[in-house]
Each structure stands twice: as structure tokens, then as C-alpha cells.
Regions:
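Cytosolic-side transmembrane-helix boundaries in multi-pass membrane proteins
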Residues: 167-174, 178-181, 234, 239-243, ...
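Short loop segments and helix-boundary regions at transmembrane helix junctions
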Residues: 27-32, 74-118, 123-124, 207-210, ...
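Membrane-interfacial amphipathic/re-entrant helices at transmembrane-helix boundaries
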Residues: 1-18, 46, 54-60, 131-133, ...
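Membrane-embedded helix boundary and interhelical linker motif in transport proteins
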Residues: 26-82, 123-129, 234-237, 264
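Helix-loop-helix "hairpin" substructures at the membrane interface of multi-pass membrane proteins
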Residues: 72, 132-213, 217, 221-222
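Transmembrane alpha-helical segments in multi-pass inner-membrane proteins
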Residues: 194, 198-274
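Transmembrane helix-bundle core of multi-pass membrane transporters
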Residues: 87, 91-155, 185, 209-210, ...
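Alpha-helical transmembrane segments within multi-pass membrane transporters and channels
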Residues: 22, 55-96, 101, 143-144, ...
């Protein structure tokens, strides 16, 4: 059980990087970007092929996976901004095309890297720590660094314009901001993080698979919603932007812990997609029910005071 929970934490932290990417489009830009399933697998496929077929350094392979994800995001951005295709449809088109592209890149449905070195195995050899522990430590370090960089970036003029585009596109456009540029930046940045996560998880699990991105959007949304629900329990709630970013990563860890516990209790692994959908639905319903409860309680207290 302890080993399963440790593996869940390592997976949760690494997936948290992807969740941050989805957070940018889903929460900040208010765009349902469906590219992520494809760009996640793209990052993993590019990373695996470079390591296995070209003996590229694992770190450079990760950076290449991140760049590949950014290119996928740019394609979606071009379809959305230049050709004015609705964002959700543009993402679906890119996602579908990436399925064939990933197959072309690997030349087969999966590519194992069991005999090759990875970032995690290299650090494990240097430190003597188990690879599962190394994955947790490196994942936390990367997640903290990315959260800090995103917090700084979204405090800049460009980052603030990007956030304002998601809040009120017409207002920010009236102020002279090119919203097409902000959308493009957001989609490229988002999918770069998703490609980075795909490459890291590829090295963590020692293989890349054509279907490794299937359902990634559901997992990410579940993590975001879980993180927001838990973040509201903090004294300051989600008022601080840094807390919103950190809660997305924390929500990812909680999601994978829940999944590991449920699997240990004997749930069929084939039912995990159903569990993910239920978690998202429940997490979305809880804030609504809670607000209605507080509103009803305030009405009751007001009636008692008037009586």
C-alpha cells in the first residue's frame, strides 16, 4: 500500500506540470483546449524516439518534447486566431492529427526505453536514492520552479493582458491589446508545459505509448477542480494567484492518491475513467451546493432575527 501511495505521489507531481498547462487555457483564458491529449503524447513520443533511436541526452529529449508540445499549441493557435475556427474545434482537429503524427514519429504504437538511461535513473545513480523517490523530489522541484515562473510571468504586462483576455476579451481589446497574440502565447505556453509533462512521464514510466494522452484532459480538469475545492478551505481562499497555481498541482497529487487507494481497495482499473468523471462532477457540484446552503442559512438567520 505504501509503495502504491509513493508511486501515486510521484505521478501526481509530474502530472501536476500538465495540470498547470491546462489551467492556463481552461481557467485563465477560458478556452476549452482539446489539444492537450495529443500534445501530451507528442512530448512523450518525441522524447522516447530521441533517446532510443538517436541516443540523445535525456535532458535534451525532455526539452525537445516541450518544444514539440509548443508547436502543437501554435498550430491550434493559428487555426483559432488566423482562420477563426472555434477554439474547441481547432483543438480537436489538432488532437486528431497528432494521433497520426505520433504514430509516424515512433513508427509503431509504443516505444520502450527500458535499456536506456533517463533523468531519473541518472540522478538515482548519483544520489543512491530509489527512482520513485527521485521522481518525487525532481517533480516537486520542477513544479515549484514552474509555479514561481508562471507567477512572475502573469504579473508582467503581457501576462496581465493574457489574464484580462480570459476575463473580458472585448474590454481588453478596446484598450488596444491584440487578443489574438495573447491567445497564441497562452496556447503555446500551455502546450509546452503539457509536452514537458509528457516527456517527463515517458521517462518515469520507461515507455511512450500512442494512447498515453487519452483522457488526460479529464484527469487535468479533475485535478484543477479538486485543487480549487481544497484551496477554498484555506484562510485566504483562492484570492491569491500563487495559491491558485499551487492548488492545481496539489489537486493532481490528491487525484492520484484517490485513484491509488481505490485501486488498492479492489476497483477494476477499467473503471478509472468513470471514476474520473464522477470526481469532476462531484467536485463541480460541491461549491454550488455549499453556496446554496450558505445562502439558505443566511435567509433563515434573517427570518429569525426579524421574528
Amino acid at each position: 500500500m505504501l509503495i502504491a501511495l509513493q508511486g501515486a505521489v510521484s505521478q501526481g507531481v509530474l502530472w501536476g506540470i500538465m495540470v498547470l498547462g491546462v489551467f492556463i487555457t481552461f481557467r485563465l483564458l477560458d478556452i476549452p483546449d482539446m489539444t492537450c491529449d495529443g500534445s501530451f503524447a507528442l512530448g512523450g513520443c518525441v522524447c522516447a524516439v530521441l533517446i532510443v533511436n538517436n541516443n540523445v541526452d535525456p535532458l535534451l529529449a525532455v526539452l525537445a518534447g516541450m518544444c514539440a508540445g509548443a508547436i502543437a499549441g501554435a498550430v491550434t493557435g493559428i487555426l483559432t486566431t488566423v482562420f477563426e475556427i472555434p477554439a474547441i474545434l481547432a483543438g480537436i482537429l489538432t488532437q486528431i492529427s497528432l494521433w497520426s503524427i505520433n504514430l509516424r514519429i515512433m513508427g509503431k504504437s509504443n516505444t520502450p526505453i527500458l535499456a536506456k538511461g533517463t533523468i531519473f535513473s541518472s540522478v538515482s545513480h548519483m544520489t543512491g536514492l530509489p527512482q520513485s523517490t527521485v521522481a518525487i523530489i525532481l517533480g516537486i522541484v520542477l513544479a515549484v520552479a514552474i509555479v514561481a515562473i508562471l507567477y512572475w510571468f502573469f504579473g508582467t504586462e503581457i501576462g496581465s493582458a493574457l489574464r484580462a483576455t480570459g476575463n473580458n476579451e472585448y474590454m481588453i481589446r478596446a484598450l488596444g491589446v491584440n487578443t489574438n497574440s495573447t491567445k497564441m502565447i497562452a496556447l503555446v505556453l500551455s502546450n509546452a508545459l503539457i509536452g514537458l509533462a509528457g516527456a517527463l512521464i515517458c521517462q518515469s514510466q520507461k515507455y511512450a505509448d500512442i494512447g498515453m494522452g487519452t483522457g488526460a484532459i479529464v484527469i487535468s480538469l479533475a485535478a484543477i477542480v479538486i485543487g480549487e475545492v481544497l484551496g477554498r478551505l484555506l484562510p485566504g481562499g483562492l484570492t491569491q494567484f500563487s495559491v491558485r497555481l499551487a492548488s492545481a498541482v496539489f489537486g493532481s497529487v490528491v487525484y492520484f492518491l484517490i485513484r491509488a487507494i481505490v485501486l488498492q481497495l479492489g476497483m477494476d482499473a477499467n473503471d478509472m475513467k468513470l471514476l474520473s468523471a464522477v470526481i469532476v462532477a462531484v467536485a463541480l457540484c460541491v461549491p454550488v451546493v455549499w453556496e446554496r446552503y450558505k445562502l439558505r442559512s443566511s435567509y433563515t438567520k434573517g427570518d429569525e432575527a426579524n421574528a
